[in-house]
Amino acid sequence: MIDESTADGYVFRVDLRLRPDPVSTPVAISVNSAFAYYENVGQNWERAALIKARPVAGDIAIGAAFLSDLSPFIWRKYFDFAAIADIHAMKRQIHAVRGHETIAVAGHDIKLGRGGIREIEFFVQTQQLVFGGRRTALRGRRTLD
């Protein structure tokens, strides 16, 4: 119902592929299953998404505890070359989908275009992923903290 399209548009679009193992698990999984997933097969794009995660509904304390317990997954002390290559691949994919045309003042997409908001956020999150495990000051959810 929440992602249903009405005459007024979507209430809220939900992409159910953006969750642990979407092909073989139910929409909601146990906390232990989530921990096992992230510990064993969690990916860098999920780390990046979890940087900004925060509980917003339900039992806020349980949500905060979950994110706190997931902290070692999000904030790795040692980031290997494969992980850095994976981040580069994410950036290449963004450019392939969105393109990376030159900046033109008239009609330039300030959100998704070259040098736009999303590119700045990606740069900041990359720095957080690479260095946040050792530098706790980089662990903020806001881009401009």
Regions found by a protein language model. Name each.
Residues 1-145:
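A nucleotide- and high-energy phosphate-metabolite-utilizing enzyme signature
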